[in-house]
Design a protein with these regions (language model features):
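A short, proline-enriched helix->beta-strand linker immediately N-terminal to the Walker B motif
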Residues: 176-180
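Conserved ABC ATPase "signature" region
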Residues: 80, 133-152
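ABC ATPase NBD coupling module
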Residues: 81-99, 117, 125
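Conserved ABC ATPase signature
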Residues: 156-161, 165
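Conserved ABC transporter NBD signature motif
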Residues: 69-80
Length: 200
C-alpha cells in the first residue's frame, strides 16, 4: 500500500524551535516537516549542528529548559505534541510509545546504579512489570544487544563497560519497552561494524 493511502503514526508539520539566550530568541529549527509510517525506517540527514537532534528531541519533550516549540504541529495518536507543556503530559508517551537512543551513552546512564537496575527501571516505569519478571526481561535485552555473560554484566556499573558496551546498554534500555517509535541519534557510533549491522 502506498504511503499516500496510509495514515502516518507521526506527522510533523512546519515545526519551529527557538532558544532564549541572553534576552534574545534564537531560531534553531525553521519549518521542518516529516511523516513516519508504521514499520518504516526514516533517516534525518544533515551537517553537524544543523538541528537534527533538537528536532527529534522535540518529539519527546526533551528540549533544554531555554528551548521551546514556537510553531507547527507534531501529531501522534491524534494529539498535537507541540502543545504539550508539562512533564506529566510527556510521561504518557516518553519511553512507553516513543523512545530514544542518545548519542552519548555516558550522559544517558546513571554512574551510581548498576546496569541491570537501570534497564529494570525503564521496564517498571513504562510497563508496570516488577521483580523477577522485570529482571528476566532486562537480562533478555542484554542478550539481544550482544552483551556477553549478561548475568555478570547485569551486576556491574557503567564505568566497568567499554564505550561500545555502554552504547549497547542504552539501546537495550530504549528498546526494552517495545515503543511504537524508536528514535536513534547516531546509535552505533561506538560499535564495531559487525555489531552495527546487527543492531540496525
Amino acid at each position: 500500500m502506498a504511503n499516500m493511502e496510509r495514515e502516518p503514526i507521526l506527522s510533523a508539520r512546519d515545526v519551529e524551535i527557538s532558544f532564549s539566550l541572553r534576552g534574545k530568541k534564537l531560531n534553531a529549527i525553521r519549518r521542518c516537516s516529516l511523516d513516519l509510517y508504521q514499520g518504516e525506517t526514516l533517516a534525518i540527514v544533515g551537517e553537524s549542528g544543523s538541528g537534527k537532534s533538537v528536532f527529534t528531541k522535540s518529539f519527546l519533550g526533551m528540549l533544554d529548559a531555554n528551548g521551546s516549540i514556537t510553531g507547527g504541529s507534531i501529531l501522534f495518536e491524534g494529539k498535537d505534541l507541540a502543545k504539550y507543556k508539562t512533564e506529566k503530559d510527556w510521561m504518557t508517551i516518553r519511553g512507553k510509545k516513543i523512545s530514544m537512543v542518545m548519542q552519548d551513552p555516558m550522559t544517558s546512564l546513571n554512574p551510581l546504579k548498576k546496569i541491570g537496575r537501570q534497564i529494570e527501571e525503564s521496564i517498571e516505569l513504562n510497563q508496570g512489570i516488577k521483580g523477577p519478571e522485570a529482571k528476566k526481561m532486562a537480562l533478555e535485552m542484554l542478550k539481544k544487544v550482544g552483551i556477553p555473560d549478561p548475568e555478570r554484566r547485569y551486576q556491574q556499573y557503567p564505568h566497568e563497560f567499554s564505550g561500545g558496551m555502554r552504547q549497547r546498554v542504552v539501546i537495550a534500555i530504549a528498546a526494552a519497552c517495545h515503543p511504537q517509535i524508536l528514535i536513534c541519534d547516531e546509535p552505533t557510533t561506538a560499535l564495531d561494524v559487525t555489531i552495527q549491522a546487527q543492531i540496525l
